[in-house]
Amino acid sequence: MILPAGMDSGQSLAAEMRSAFSENGLLAGSSDFEYRPEQQEMAEAVGRSLERESYLVVEAGTGVGKSLAYLLPAVHYGLESGRKAVFSTHTINLQEQLLRKDLPLVRKLAGRPFRAALLKGRGNYVCPARLKQARMNSGDLFSSSESDELEAIWKWFETTQDGTLSDMDFQPTPKVWQMVCSEAEICS
């Protein structure tokens, strides 16, 4: 059992989640926790779905606490079963929220270490080969302001840690970024 005291290991995952998300449950000790019946219901449904290895579609409005309602049962299930979980989000901002805010809380609650990684789509990464090619042909491809932007991307590229668009301190125009971002046919 990964969840600490107060969680009976004989309970189903759904029941453990109902308890964890209750007004006096495991999450109640967290300073950010606010009891939400919808969140509790969702966490229980996710737990039940994982136990049954069945599909689940959930729709919930803003402020329900969806992230924790799917993260905690999935991480618990993964640690207990030795299986992996993948969380796909619509935005990189939500991915980063999961990684920087929600998963640290889940890690603390889990009481056992687990690994998490942020994976972004290929178009979010600069392609060194395409960047070099664009620089060589910038006079033919870009206006003077776009060429300046390309040079700013080059300067950033020389110091970036991960080569992702979100690592930039400016937002390049779509035209320039499309000429230097990673593509399956060209970049490896």
Describe the function of each predicted region.
Residues 47-48, 68-81, 101-105:
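Walker A/P-loop NTP-binding motif
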Residues 6-58:
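Conserved pre-motif I regulatory segment
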Residues 2-29, 82-188:
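A substrate-engagement module of RecA-like helicase motors
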Residues 51-73:
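Walker A/P-loop
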Residues 36, 65-67, 127, 164:
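Alpha-helix initiation/capping motif
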Residues 33-37, 58-65, 90-94:
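Alpha-helix capping and helix-loop boundary segments enriched in small/acidic/polar residues
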Residues 52-56, 80-86:
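Short, surface-exposed connector motifs at secondary-structure boundaries
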